[in-house]
Swiss-Prot record:
Sites of Phosphoserine modification: 224, 256, 265-266, 302, 311
GO biological process terms on file: arachidonate secretion; mitochondrial protein catabolic process; mitochondrial protein quality control; mitochondrion organization; phospholipid metabolic process
Compositional bias annotation for Basic and acidic residues: 191-202, 245-266
Pfam families assigned to the protein according to its UniProt record, in alphabetical order: Phospholip_A2_2
Compositionally biased intervals (Polar residues): 139-155
PANTHER family, per database record: RH14732P
InterPro entries: PLipase_A2_dom, PLipase_A2_dom_sf
Protein name: Protein PROCA1
Domain of life from the UniProt record: Eukaryota
Entry keyword annotation includes Phosphoprotein: yes
GO cellular component, one term: mitochondrion
Keywords: Phosphoprotein
Composition skew (Basic residues), residue ranges: 203-218
Length: 311
């Protein structure tokens, strides 16, 4: 994500008060790019340069850090030279006691281009050529079009106006990034679990179907009912049918139904009681007559007993 930032630095300009220090010609300043040329101005800087005083060359360039930079020398950011600290460093040192005492700070805006080149030598001509090529590319895209901003080489730049710079950076803090990463990992794990569950469901269904088929297979392997009727006698079939719970329930239901039919109601019992008495009396008479007849026939059929006296 691209984040808009502004960078302002302080530069030392020559004071109007007369001094006997050695002055450098204006031609040295004109050798620098237009956006790095320093011109005297009456605007004091409101920015604090303490943030720029930390870096790898703090001890070696303490003089330049203390008094900032003379307009003759070139300022480079560490990111341009392969370093990644938030500070500035000078290509060549300056004699602060003889040169920088007559300068005061003013605000100057510079570009921090995102390209990283190898830090080889301190040749000013090579560095200027590289910087000019970079600034030409940046001016077409990154430089603002407002009239209040820094102007091109033809006009005097407004040194107090900062230049907007676009750089790539993350809009989220490290702690927030960690939370976001954890949430993403949790979501991924939940998705993986859901996919695993979806994949396991058809497998479980297939396993259950396989178990049911295995249970049904021994029943199919047995002989058909037609074969059983041929091999088993009808008595055994009746016994098996009676022994089965379904047949027992059917028989019990049929018996109970028939018993219910045989049992007469109370009215039928009252009506049939005199008839039964008459029938019973008639049957008793018939039985008595039959008994008498049988006795008579038995008496007739019995042979005569021989009398021993007659013999």
């Amino acid at each position: 994500m691209w984040v808009r930032t502004t960078v302002t630095i302080r530069r030392w300009s020559e004071e109007k008060s007369g001094c006997n220090h050695e002055r450098y010609p204006r031609t040295d300043i004109t050798r620098l790019p237009s956006w790095k040329r320093g011109y005297p101005a009456s605007v004091e800087s409101s920015s604090d340069m303490s943030s720029f005083s930390e870096g790898e060359n703090k001890e070696t360039e303490r003089c330049c850090w203390k008094h900032q930079q003379c307009p003759v020398h070139i300022i480079h950011s560490f990111s341009d030279c392969g370093h990644h600290n938030r500070c500035m460093h000078a290509v060549s040192h300056c004699n602060c006691e003889s040169r920088c005492q007559s300068y005061r700070p003013i605000s100057v805006a510079i570009f921090h281009h995102p390209t990283h080149h190898m830090y080889m030598t301190d040749d000013l001509n090579d560095l200027e050529a590289n910087q000019l090529a970079i600034t030409n590319n940046l001016c077409s895209t990154d430089r603002p079009t407002d009239p209040n901003s820094v102007e091109s080489t033809t006009g005097a730049p407004d040194l107090s106006a900062p230049i907007t710079i676009w750089r790539s950076a993350s809009p989220i803090d490290k702690c927030q990034e960690g939370k976001v990463i954890k949430n993403i990992k949790k979501k991924k794990k939940e998705k993986d679990k859901e996919e695993m569950m979806v994949d396991e469901k058809p497998k479980l269904k297939k396993k259950a179907k396989g178990k049911l088929i295995k249970k049904k297979s021994p029943m199919k392997s047995e002989s058909s009912p037609a074969d059983l009727s041929h091999s088993i006698s009808p008595r055994e079939l009746v016994r098996t049918s009676e022994s089965s719970p379904d047949s027992r329930e059917g028989l019990e239901s049929e018996d109970s139904y028939e018993r219910g039919k045989e049992r007469p109601s109370s009215e039928d019992i009252v009506e049939s009681s005199p008839k039964k008495k008459e029938k019973c009396s008639a049957q008793a008479k018939k039985n008595a007559t039959k008994n008498l007849q049988t006795r008579k026939t038995s008496k007739r059929k019995s042979p005569p007993v021989p009398n021993p006296n007659l013999s």
